[in-house]
Swiss-Prot record:
HAMAP family: IlvD (MF_00012). This is Dihydroxy-acid dehydratase 3. The gene is ilvD3. The keyword rRNA processing does not apply. Belongs to the IlvD/Edd family. It catalyses: (2R)-2,3-dihydroxy-3-methylbutanoate = 3-methyl-2-oxobutanoate + H2O; (2R,3R)-2,3-dihydroxy-3-methylpentanoate = (S)-3-methyl-2-oxopentanoate + H2O. [2Fe-2S] cluster binds at C67, C140, C212. Binds 1 [2Fe-2S] cluster per subunit. This cluster acts as a Lewis acid cofactor.
Amino acid sequence: MKLRCPAAYGTSHVDDANMKKLRSRITTDGLDRAPHRAFMRAMGLDDAAIAKPMVGIVSMKGEQTPCNMTHDFQVAAAKTGIEEAGGTPREFSTVSVSDGISMNHEGMKFSLFSRELIADSIEAVVHGLAYDALIGYGGCDKTLPGVMMGMVRCNVPSIFIYGGSSLPGRVDGRTLTVLDSYEAVGSFMTGEIDSATLERIERACLPTIGACAGQFTANTMGMVSEAMGLTIPNVSMVPGVYAERAQISRRAGRLIMEMLERGGPLPRDIVTRKSLENGAAIVAATGGSTNAALHLPAIANEAGIAFTIDDVGEVFARTPLIGNLRPGGKYTAKDVHDIGGAAVVIQELIRTGHIDGNCITITGRTLAEEYGAANAPDGEVVYAASAPIMPDGGVAVLKGNLCPDGAVIKVAGLKSQFFEGVARVFEDEEACVAAVRDRSYKAGEVLVIRNEGPVGGPGMREMLGVTALIYGQGMGEKVALITDGRFSGATRGMCIGYVSPEAFVGGPLALVRDGDKIRIDATNRRMDMLVDEPELAARRRDWKPRPPRHRAGALAKYARLVGQAPGGAVTHEGPAEWPWFE
């Protein structure tokens, strides 16, 4: 059967096979699609453009954050590549909440929530407009997993592109990232630096647009996209302001058309248990963001794979730390790029059996084929796995009576992985920040911030503001901090987050009282409150749930839907199916 479109100049003929292959034909072909084509013509598309495959390009370009401001020229280059290869690019945008600007106030409740909004909005546009394929850009922290989740949910030929990091700053010969500005506030409070120095750091630490320069959440998830095979090989560490990024995007535009022609590989072909383990391995190997322990299960959920914080923790425990990267180490993303890129890490982990090189990538080739020619570790930025910085990874998942379903700590850079102290309980982040600003806390205390989990926050706020103050005051390893909220990828010190179950739903964190003794033993992956079980049982009987903080609006809807941290704090379970497009 052939369909004639008399409304189109030149008449379009599409047989059943192509109708099945190109989803967009449901919007472009046939007599009754004349109104649809009219809308397309109003956007400047001619007959030839309407007849070609429609490729969506999603980004967050805008003025919310410098992290996404590299997207503009990269998207333009991707459009060129698509057009050169015979496709019609269709650009659209989605939300982004700057983790930096929303930090340490109520706005941070929207950060993790925005990850779900991004995935949802990609699903809405790609399926709502029946695009044939997708190129998705990420920049600020939650945009990367949000886009990857959206890609896997839609399951059309897709390429993820990380927009790249900023260049590091310099003051007095010292390399800076934005973390230095957070910690400098604490240093100023103690008198270690003066206001002039604080201002110089503020003005110098982010000299260009692009995401934060250390191995914080954005760069971590950029590397994860490589280790999982969802992006063009060895591009994640190219700084966002480099002209090379235009070449990368133009290549992506051509490659997406090749993927569309051959029918894949599709995101759910790429996202497997093995590729998820590869993603977890590169997090551990580089001392990456603890947020990855939340994002990997969320990506897995979109593919229908049960991959929880326990699975992430197993990979963390068997993977050596070989990346000497900030915040636990010395170097930045640019330094990794200068020695050969993420390929150096990936190939070293493939060589030593910590990454499965047989996993497929978007190119149709395996990781081993794509990364086999990578440079060897330089021994300074990236160590050999046979002589690692640490033998068992820079991030750890803890269990114990305080976190029966798990908690996460970044151990990279810690002088000691053991801490025992007495609890000082705060019912929200603001109360703890006030105590730290007043310096009304002391060495040996375990600062407990609760009711900041996915439901209780709601939104599971990041605590970089308070952890950086503590570190800047020289107390980073003299106290511990525990929370059912999250940490920034830039957090360092004895900080344990993602405690689950969260306090708001009756998790053990809700039972902690001032003066309770708490033991943290990261070496043995344990965290416990040293309180007798009869006393804990009595506290459980007395515990009463708190009223929700939001009864209407977006956060109220989020709180009703969101799950706990071990499963990724997702708002639905399992893969979305669209049989209409199958």
